[in-house]
């Protein structure tokens, strides 16, 4: 419905590269072009972002570091059940490609 409306969105920011690729397919199916009509940005930084056409701009997150850190925090909590909760922040990177 949004793609057929008189006032369409300028851009889509998807919660994953997979959903962004689906949005690009829906945009093309509606006879519109990415990024000329609607820009698209994904999130994850997966290999899929380089395989779609046009290549997908994405927010790359350090997935392996997130996994390692989560396991370390879990093991620490198992060994020290009374340990306070920890908040961990990790860097991300915007990868500019042709979709936005």
What is each model feature region?
Residues 1:
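A short, Lys/Arg-enriched amphipathic alpha-helix from helix-turn-helix/homeodomain DNA-binding modules
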Residues 4-100:
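Flexible loop/turn connectors
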């Amino acid at each position: 419905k949004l793609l057929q409306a008189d006032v369409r969105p300028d851009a889509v920011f998807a919660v994953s590269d997979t959903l962004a690729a689906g949005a690009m397919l829906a945009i093309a199916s509606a006879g519109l072009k990415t990024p000329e009509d609607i820009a698209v940005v994904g999130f994850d930084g997966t290999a899929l972002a380089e395989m779609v056409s046009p290549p997908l701009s994405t927010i790359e997150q350090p997935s392996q570091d997130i996994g390692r850190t989560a396991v370390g925090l879990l093991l620490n909590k198992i060994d020290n059940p009374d340990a306070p909760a920890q908040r961990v922040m990790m860097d991300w990177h915007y990868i500019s490609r042709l979709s936005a």
